[in-house]
Amino acid sequence: MADTGSFIHLARPLGPATVGVAPSTAPLNVVIQPQAIFSILDHSLRRNADQERVIGTLLGTRSEDGTEVEIRTCFAVGHTETTDQVEVDMEYQKQMLALHLKANPKEVLVGWYATSSELNTFSALIQNFYGGQGDGTWPHPAVHLTVSTEPGKDIETRTYISAPVGVTAERAADSAAFIPVPYEIRYSEAERNGLEAIAQARDAEDRASSLFTDIETLEKSIEEVLGMIDRVSKYVESVIDEEAPASTALGQFLLNALALAPKVDPADIESDFNKHIQDVLVVSYLANTIRTQMELSNRLATAQLTLGGGDSTAIGGTGAESGGQRGGQRNNRQRGGQQRNQAEELRA
């Protein structure tokens, strides 16, 4: 999460005033979903070798008062960029935007992204297009998201909005003042666990990672908490011994964290923890029992189908044999009748 205390919020007129429409001037906070970042990184990996950056459109939701924007999805937009000019496939952008809005009616256009931290004249030109009237985000500000994708370096993410600067009318289209705004990458507990499981396969030779059981997950969580407590204890001891500089903000954060701890006896905590362990064991036992029962049911069903097919074959064979016997008896009776007729003719 970005440090929200290092940002200043300014009033931001985004263009010429329209009758009955006023631009939003409230502070803005941006929430980014992880799937949007992954889509941007995937787009960066598929870019041409001669492209320094790629761009695309950001879609998401906006709060009723316009003070919070949530970036949920995005799609790539083709463009060519040289030292003298930039060309963006706006027709493709409009068609894809209409298609996405038709599939997700609750989402709206919120801005655009680029895989470069550099802000230049071309960035201002694209920003003014996305924040303009008609097909843009007017009267709300267009959010510009930059994601650095340099190999071997950490991924840096920044968010901006823009405001016009005092230039001539001829330079208004490619001029803008980019203002940083706070942001946060918000993800659920399930998404975090999934990402951790995927990250564990990074160093494996077969690129595979096994899922943890409930007991293993609980053990890992306890180890992480103990590790964090150990780091905090070492930091506090180093500050007390004047080996490390003190931080008022960090001290206030630790004080607030300790204030949230419930004031209960250690014996009660141990009792509750043991009960939780028992609950986890019961759930794990029931899950294994259900899994075993399902496997047994599948095996019984397979065996029943196999035995049922054999019985049908045997019954069919018995029927054929009995039919053959009946046919043979009829033939014997016919031959016996013929012999009696011949004997009577001879006597006559």
UniProtKB/Swiss-Prot annotation:
Residues 328-341 have a biased composition (Low complexity). GO terms for cellular component: eukaryotic 43S preinitiation complex; eukaryotic 48S preinitiation complex; eukaryotic translation initiation factor 3 complex, eIF3m. InterPro entries: eIF3f, EIF3F/CSN6-like_C, JAMM/MPN+_dom, MPN. GO terms for molecular function: metallopeptidase activity; translation initiation factor activity; translation initiation factor binding. It is found in: Cytoplasm. It comes from the Eukaryota. SMART domains: JAB_MPN (SM00232). Residues 312-327 have a biased composition (Gly residues). Keywords: Cytoplasm, Initiation factor, Protein biosynthesis. Its main location: cytoplasm. Residues 30-166 form the MPN domain. Residues 312-348 are annotated as: Disordered. Belongs to the eIF-3 subunit F family. Component of the eukaryotic translation initiation factor 3 (eIF-3) complex, which is involved in protein synthesis of a specialized repertoire of mRNAs and, together with other initiation factors, stimulates binding of mRNA and methionyl-tRNAi to the 40S ribosome. The eIF-3 complex specifically targets and initiates translation of a subset of mRNAs involved in cell proliferation. This is Eukaryotic translation initiation factor 3 subunit F. It comes from Coccidioides immitis (strain RS).
